[in-house]
Amino acid sequence: MAILKSALVGFICFLHFFIVNASDNKSLLTEDIMASQVCNGMFAKKGKTSEITLKIDSYTSDFGGAIRLLIFNWKDVNAIGMEDDDGEKHYICNYEDIEAGVCKDDDYGLYLINQTAPHDSIYSAAVDAESMVSPLKYPVEQSGLYCVFTAPLEGSSEAYKITVTWENYFGNLDATDYPHLFLNPILLAINCLIGIWWSFIMFRYRHDLLQVQKYISGVVALSIVCTMVSTGYFYFANSKGYTTGSKVFAFFLSLAQSARQSYFGFLLLIVSLGYSIVVPSLGSLLRKCQILAGLQFVSSCFFLSSLFISPSNKESLVILFAAPVFLITLFAMFLWIVLALNNTIRDLRIRKQTVKAQMYTRLWIVICFGIVAYASIVAANAILIGIYGQMNYYLKYWKLLWFLNYGYTDILVLILMLTILYLWRPTENNRRFAMSEQVAQDVDEFEMTSSLSNDSLHLHHERPTSPANPHIIHGSADEHQALFAVDDESDDDASTLATSKQKPA
């Protein structure tokens, strides 16, 4: 059970890699050695105020002691600690160090600072928690990675809780989320331009639209809504902080992201099954696709909303329940898409429908490119963490985390969506190629989760154009555009369309 729980938590952390949500700009420190230190990026700007605020929430001590405190920019880390005559480095002044001459009586209990080493950001002091009425403020004058180290002055006799607030000059967002304020509006503008372009060609060829193209319009609309809500969320969180209003905003953002992700997967699935292009109707298979997408949407909503509202609570029961369901549905949909697309391409090639096979081959290339591109950034992160270690990786690349964690993924998804829209865009050839006798008569032959037998391939083949049969279309320059074989207005009249005759071009 413990292994399963660890695996689920690990999977949640992996999903957290590409989930776009804001990190709280507050950290909680306690006397526990594993929770007494924290580091975070900070941005500074001339004429603007950035500061680190420490507020003691609770404190208990048997001896009325104090809390040793150290705040510094990581670039000055080499100045922390003093070496004795044997070259051994000491970080906290104790009685042995005083006797050895490493530090003075006034330094007892404090973090030691090498005054001969260059530094300009280190603050070391013993804080009397009981007399500390107002929060301690540390001014940030240079952009960098800042750390706050604490420890009980009297050891295990003291217990405390300290809230550290990282207040950047631009607002309440964490430093790693700051690029959202620029990236999201750009993505929103691009998605709106894509929406205008798609609406124009949909209106231009409104009499030749296929049902699958109407489904594609839903992806465009959801992308605009998702980027709009995401932009509003981060601007609201930056302005108002992580309040109840921010959590409500985050909940709607989780709904939008879940809807876009599930719908996009559903669209890829029905396209891979040949809907509107190879077969006029999916029959009961369409309902199965909708059920799978619905399960993924519900589990994703629970999962994302829990992470948005409580980002630090990765082991809650809701997350531990929703994560495996989300994983199963995500894997099932991906596997189904791959199998369906592979079988569709194979069937089209067997039937010598080269133009359609080329369209689906291009879609396969786009999907493979997306998988390889995303896997590359995940692998690059894993390699860098393996080389530098998690802490040093963060210390070295914290300014690039916005790109590695979400910027790269957002840009990649936008490119993939735009490519698929271009391949499946409406054209004047929709009606022309609608009745080309390339439609399979048996929908069950496209149950892509099962193997295709040779006996199931006795379908209509494309025939070359001849004077005796001018109604059959074969090979033209227009075939290299985005071609659609079926003008499918609905599943109900699909069989009628499949048996209709095409007018001479």
Swiss-Prot record:
Domain of life of the source: Eukaryota
InterPro entries cross-referenced by the UniProt entry: GOST_TM, GPR107/GPR108-like, PTM1-like_N
Signal sequence, renumbered to the chain: 1-22
Biological-process GO terms, alphabetical: retrograde transport, endosome to Golgi
Keywords: Glycoprotein, Membrane, Signal, Transmembrane, Transmembrane helix
Main localization, broad class: membrane
Membrane topology: Multi-pass membrane protein
Cysteine disulfide partners in this protein: none
Subcellular locations according to the entry: Membrane
Residue positions the entry lists as glycosylated: N25, N114, N342, N454
GO cellular component: cytoplasm; cytosol; Golgi apparatus; membrane
Transmembrane regions: 181-201, 216-236, 266-286, 291-311, 318-338, 365-385, 400-420
Family, per entry: Belongs to the LU7TM family.
The name this protein goes by in its record: Uncharacterized protein C26H5.07c
The organism's taxonomic lineage, starting at the top: Eukaryota, Fungi, Dikarya, Ascomycota, Taphrinomycotina
